[in-house]
Amino acid sequence: KPAYVSHYRLEAEEIIDLIKNSGGTPVLAHPKLIHNDALVEELLKNGIEGIEAIYPKHDEEDTKRYLELAEKYHLLVTGGSDFHGIPGRWPQQIGEFVVDDCYAEELYREPEL
C-alpha cells in the first residue's frame, strides 16, 4: 500500500541510550505488566535508572518486591496514578494517589558526575 510505513523495533539498550543521551532518566513503568520478573531484572541491569514501584494496581507484595529491586540496583523509585483523564476508569482521581516524599525528593537531587 502506498501509505504503509514498516515498523521497526529498538532494543531496550538502544532506547535507554536514547533517553540518557537526550538528558532524560530512563524509568521502567508498570513492571508488573511485563509478567516476567527475570525480564524486569534484565532491564534493570541494562541501564534503567528508576522503577515505578508505587502504582495503584500493585498489591502490597508487588510494591515490596519492586522497592527491594530498587534498593538492590540503586534505582530511583517512582510512582503514579496512571490517570489519563477518563473519570470512573480508575478507582482514584488525579491527585488522590501520592508517592512518599522520601522517594520524590530523590528525583530532585543533582546527578553525580
Describe the predicted segments one by one.
Residues 11:
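Ligand-binding pocket segment of bilobal, Venus flytrap-like solute-binding proteins
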Residues 1-8:
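Active-site-proximal loop/helix segment associated with metal-binding centers of metalloenzymes
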Residues 14-17, 21-22, 28, 32-113:
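Charged catalytic cores and adjacent phosphate/nucleic-acid-binding surfaces used
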